[in-house]
């Protein structure tokens, strides 16, 4: 059951809790509809790999919060949390104090942005073979872990997660099924290696797709291709 597909609403799920590695991983669950609330579990987890003598959990927490915060402004979540062994966290009072500050900052954001629509400069469509089914996860490998072959492509999605754009993920089949679909957007972004689901592969040999995209550009729309679109 894909959370971005229409049938997801039928399962009656109360909430979605997701681990936050960066802005895109936050949008991966904050954009899910038909649930009562979404909650972000922020890093670091209270585990010995970070909470040890010489470790710097405050630095990791700051990087994580600042990276994800801009995405919260675009697509608000309702709750935040941390997890792990509390005993380890108590041994780092500076960390506890910083998390207190994060919680207060989140409360300010929550009070001011819930139920509002953020300002959007342009409407952007990310075009690939999956469309909305894999929104925000179309270039994601093992959460927010660095992956050499995919890093630059994922960086584009990460940038979009907190940018002032109304972002949608559309597929080539969406274009075939709705001749006027592209009229809803200002820019199309197509990202990926040749002959992959990310870039579209043989879809670009379809005259129907070529005609629709060329018409879109002719009428003033922007097309950004990265990699081998």
Feature-to-residue mapping (PLM):
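Hydrophobic targeting/anchoring helices
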Residues: 1-150
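Helical hinge/lid and interdomain linker segments adjacent to catalytic or ligand-binding clefts
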Residues: 145-229
